[in-house]
Design a protein with these regions (language model features):
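Glycine-rich, aromatic-lined ligand/substrate-binding cores of catalytic
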Residues: 46, 304-308, 312-439, 498
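Long, intrinsically disordered, low-complexity segments
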Residues: 20-23, 113-116, 197-199, 258, ...
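Conserved, well-structured interaction surfaces
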Residues: 39, 43-52, 56-66, 86-167, ...
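Short coil/turn linking the two alpha-helices of tandem helical-hairpin repeats
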Residues: 162-165, 169-171, 213, 239-248, ...
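Bacterial Sec-dependent N-terminal signal peptides
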Residues: 1-31
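Short, surface-exposed recognition loops and adjoining beta-strand edges that mediate ligand/DNA contacts
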Residues: 65-84, 173, 209-228, 244-346, ...
Length: 621
């Protein structure tokens, strides 16, 4: 079975790199201008091409920023569209700085997802086994086709899920095949209809997909398995139970179809029970025969780094179609390399808000919260030695350098995420600085706005140094176990905050990061629903930082328009890059961030609204 999946995969993903197609002419392009679907699906090569194209819109969360036009809603502009990052170049650069309307919103998934759903439905309806015929010896067996159709059925559900995540209530295409000359003009289904359809499809297809997780390092792919389907279903139910989709977005409650059907439901607390049930189903599968487990060898710093470098048992789903780019392409690696290094562009800046949310190594925050007291380890005064491992020729050595005390004694996830003033670049051993007059100062057209740079997911062998490694593969993670553990803690807390599983699964993530159990630091948190809720939200903020989740979390929690840890309006902050080194550590406004209540959901694309007679727009747009 595994060999068969690998055979399908090699053919499909090789073709994914060659063929892409427009919604209207995809059939002609893929089939070499053949006119009949029968002719396409009588041909093994054309059938495989059609199949391969259904996978081309799997998200790549390594794509934070790149040259204009190359970042889409299937990449990760989301990290730069919230309070995590400032993006100094590319399509996401200006998003947070101006108000938006339905006509100028970027990063839509709408048209592409519906194109992929259409292609999936055509494949499911027309693909058939193909025997050898004359000189054509390639075959498509019944067994292989069964596996292919299971994958396609999953992808159809997943594209519906991506639409739901971004827009809420959407038209459900299901098995409908729209002809090329047809316009997509269907009314929106209700939220409850959408989640019911997704639940049914993902439950069914989970039985048809491979029943074991795939972790082999040669499986550089986004191949769905039972675990992937269960994870998507579980996450979908958490969305469905959350405030945004569960009766607490007041403006959405007034949205109706033209026939009066209300699209967004009243609050239903029982949806949290369904979320818990779906998460338990996933976790049971994860625990069976070690399908998934946190990467935890007892070395938090190394584990958190290694997690993103190669396939491992924490990864539920990942893709090899990445945007790391190495040091010779205009993509992630160059943009996360300081300008002071050869070929570095240094334009992805971590916000002060994210910097400040990481815990100290004692597991406490730098400022007191309602759920944890302030750490006594934190101070902004003075400088001291920071020791780290860097390259020295062919060896790795420990070096110490004076840094601000505000950067000392932080947790391991901080050092794996944030590159800060006076830290040494890992390959060249150069001290990196961002103050006025330094090579990375606030000048030119490409720069970090905050005096920090993103370090998370970077590979520490990559550089332009000769001899050196200019490009290094690592998977682009879509779902991982820590995310699902924190969702489980969140969902159980909403049902029964006294349930010990709330802190058990929160602490699993903290323990891997080298932090104490949270109730040991504040016994009053145990069983307190609001305090546990806030602690879980903070943990998701830290653990999943810049992975494309924060944007959607603050929206489903409906905290983006409130003062507090979820605030998405006003300014994000950073160090004073306009000052000399002695004044650099003054916190200043780095970049504006605009949020309106309408931005809790994406608008349906304006060009679709101009064509439709049946669609109604999301509130405020």
């Amino acid at each position: 079975m595994k060999k068969l999946y690998k055979k399908i995969l090699i053919a499909a993903f090789a073709l994914c790199n060659i063929y892409s197609c427009d919604y209207l002419n995809v059939s002609d392009e893929l089939a070499g201008n053949l006119r009949s679907l029968d002719e396409i699906f009588d041909n093994v090569s054309y059938t495989r091409r059609w199949y391969a194209n259904i996978f081309t819109s799997i998200p790549d969360y390594s794509g934070i920023t790149a040259a204009a036009g190359s970042i889409t809603g299937f990449k990760n502009p989301w990290a730069g569209m919230c309070d995590e990052l400032t993006v100094g170049y590319g399509d996401a650069k200006l998003y947070n700085k101006t108000d938006k309307n339905a006509a100028n919103m970027n990063f839509h998934r709408w048209g592409t997802c519906y194109k992929e759903i259409r292609q999936a439905n055509i494949f499911l309806a027309h693909a058939k086994p193909i025997a050898a015929n004359g000189t054509h010896v390639d075959v498509l067996t019944e067994e292989e086709l069964t596996e292919m159709k299971a994958n396609v059925r999953f992808m159809r559900a997943y594209y519906h899920y991506l639409l739901f995540e971004q827009y809420g209530a959407i038209p459900l295409v299901k098995d409908l095949i729209l002809e090329r000359e047809d316009n997509l003009d269907l009314p929106r289904n209700t939220i409850d209809e959408v989640i019911s359809y997704l639940d049914e499809e993902l439950t069914a297809v989970a039985k048809e997909l491979p029943q074991k997780a795939l972790h082999d390092d040669d499986q550089h792919n986004a191949w769905p398995t039972k675990g992937v389907a269960l994870a998507v279903k579980a996450k979908m139910w958490v969305y469905a139970a959350s405030k945004l989709f569960n009766g607490e977005y007041k403006e959405a409650l007034a949205v109706t179809n033209l026939d009066g059907t209300r699209l967004f439901p009243d609050k239903d607390p029982n949806k949290w029970n369904k979320a818990v049930a779906a998460l338990e189903e996933f976790i049971k599968f994860a625990d069976e025969e070690g399908n998934y487990e946190l990467l935890n060898t007892g070395n938090p710093s190394q584990d958190i780094y290694d997690l993103f470098q190669t396939y491992n048992k924490e990864i539920i789903w990942a893709t090899a179609a990445t945007s790391w780019g190495g040091m010779t392409n205009d993509m992630f690696d160059r943009r996360c390399t300081p300008r002071s290094e050869q070929n570095g562009m240094g334009c992805i800046g971590v916000t002060q808000e994210l910097v400040d949310d990481f815990y100290m190594k004692d597991g406490l925050p730098i400022q007191a919260t309602s759920y944890l007291p302030q750490s006594t380890l934190y101070t902004t005064e003075g400088f001291d030695k920071y020791t780290e491992t860097v390259k020295a020729g062919s060896k790795e050595v420990q070096v110490a350098n004076n840094v601000s005390n505000r950067f000392l004694n932080r947790e391991a996830r901080f050092y794996n995420t944030v590159f800060f003033q006076n830290r040494r670049w890992h390959v060249t051993n150069n001290v990196t600085q961002f103050h006025k007059g330094s090579p990375n100062e606030l000048s030119g057209t490409i720069y970090t706005h905050t005096g920090y740079m993103l370090y998370k997911r970077f590979n520490r062998e990559v550089s332009m140094k000769s001899p050196g490694v200019q490009n290094k593969f690592r998977p682009s993670i879509i779902f991982r176990l820590a995310d699902l553990y924190l969702l489980y803690a969140e969902a159980v807390n909403e049902i029964d905050p006294q349930d010990e599983r709330v802190l058990t699964y929160l602490n699993k993530v903290r323990q891997r990061a080298g932090l104490s159990n949270i109730e040991e630091l504040n016994p009053a948190i145990e069983g307190n629903q609001e305090l546990q809720r806030l602690a879980i939200q903070r943990e998701r903020r830290i653990e999943l930082a810049t992975e494309g989740q924060r944007y959607f979390d603050v929206r489903r929690w409906m905290i983006a328009d409130q003062d507090g840890e979820g605030r998405q309006f006003g300014y994000v902050h950073g160090m004073n890059m306009n000052a000399a080194e002695d004044k650099f550590y003054e916190e200043v406004e780095a970049s504006p961030i605009v949020f309106r209540r309408k931005m809790y959901l994406y608008p349906i694309p304006d060009d679709e609204m101009k064509k439709t007679e049946l669609l109604v727009q999301n509130p405020g747009w």
